[in-house]
Amino acid sequence: MKNLNTYSQKLRESGLRPTKQRLKICEVLFSPERTFHFTVNDLTKIISEKLSEKISLATVYNTVHAFKKKGYLKEISINSDKSYFDTNVSEHHHFFDEDTNELIDCGIDEIDSVNIKKNITGKKIKSVEVLIKVATDNQNQN
């Protein structure tokens, strides 16, 4: 019951009505056992299986983007066509495996400091997020 109230509150704070489908989205996203990466399509599929009924892509898309805007999720853009979302909103970096399309967390202490040489007048750096894309090195395979 406590989680249901928490989920309803998150939805309301994000400007959304707590419907059965949106509450199910929250149940999957904010389960305390784990954090994970997903695309909107991935999440739609997971929710449909968990609900044993269809959920509209638009409902999932709008809910995810409302949560992102509120700071409950982080968006990681892989390219102009693909974005992943992360339920771990703490400061960290990512590896993206182009062979498996897997996004892998990388702690901020696992990358030496980034040396930023450009300064924009009147602005300060709020955060630095690094996305490192990796793929199989075919040159070293026999």
Protein language model regions, located:
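Amphipathic alpha-helical interaction segments
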Residues: K24-E27, D42, T59-N62
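Short alpha-helical segments that sit at the start of domains
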Residues: M1-C26
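Short helix-capping/hinge SLiMs at alpha-helix to coil transitions
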Residues: L16, S31-T35, K50-L51
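Hydrophobic alpha-helix position signal
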Residues: L11, I47-K50, F67, K118
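Basic amphipathic alpha-helical segments that dock to polyanions
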Residues: V60-K70
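DNA-recognition alpha helix
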Residues: T39-S52
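Non-DNA-binding regulatory cores of transcription-related proteins
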Residues: K70-N142
